[in-house]
Amino acid sequence: QGGLPRPGPEIPP
């Protein structure tokens, strides 16, 4: 998962 701003390392979709 990814693409959404999260408090941590963002994983690209």
From Swiss-Prot:
Tissue and organ expression note: Expressed by the venom gland.
Function field: This peptide both inhibits the activity of the angiotensin-converting enzyme (ACE) and enhances the action of bradykinin by inhibiting the peptidases that inactivate it. It acts as an indirect hypotensive agent.
Annotated organism of origin: Bothrops jararaca
Pyrrolidone carboxylic acid: residues bearing it: 1
Domain of life: Eukaryota
GO molecular function: peptidase inhibitor activity; toxin activity
Name of the molecule in the record: Bradykinin-potentiating peptide 13b
Record's keyword terms, sorted: Hypotensive agent, Metalloenzyme inhibitor, Metalloprotease inhibitor, Protease inhibitor, Pyrrolidone carboxylic acid, Secreted, Toxin
Family listed: Belongs to the bradykinin-potentiating peptide family.
Keyword field contains Isomerase: no
Subcellular location: Secreted
GO cellular component terms listed in the entry, alphabetical order: extracellular region
GO BP field: regulation of blood pressure
Principal place of residence: secreted
